[in-house]
Amino acid sequence: MRPTVYIETTIPSYYCDKRTTHINEIRRTREWWNSERDTYSCFVSQTVLEELIAGDYAGKDECLRLVEGISILSVTPEILDIAEVYQARRLMPRNPAADSVHLALASYYGMEYLLTWNCRHLANATKVRHLEHINRDLGLSIPILATPHMLQIVE
């Protein structure tokens, strides 16, 4: 069975990004997407789709096409409750609230990895122990928070 990956909004966003200010992240995202993605069972959520739709940026249609066919995880009342716990226990900020929802989705559905370029709120080593403590209290799995270059298979 392939490892599971929850793909957060920044991944398709960076894949489709045309700016030169994030060229390394864009390159690494495209490398992972084109070379590594098929070695994983990938998932997005309605939250990812809503964020992609709501944005005002060039390449929106390309981003939406990119995630077509990827399994969509449902945002349930339990997910929102978990996100609220993350906020109340100061693991995640209240704004943007979607960041805590992404983490709740990956935890609730037992994803092995949460793939993101959000290094401030998600792929941040300073949050790992806090996440482990909260998720153990809640009886949830603990996803590995990773960026695309951290999730490349090296032979």
Question: What are these language model-derived features?
Answer:
Residues 46, 76, 148-149:
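Residues at the C-termini of beta-strands that transition into short coil/loop
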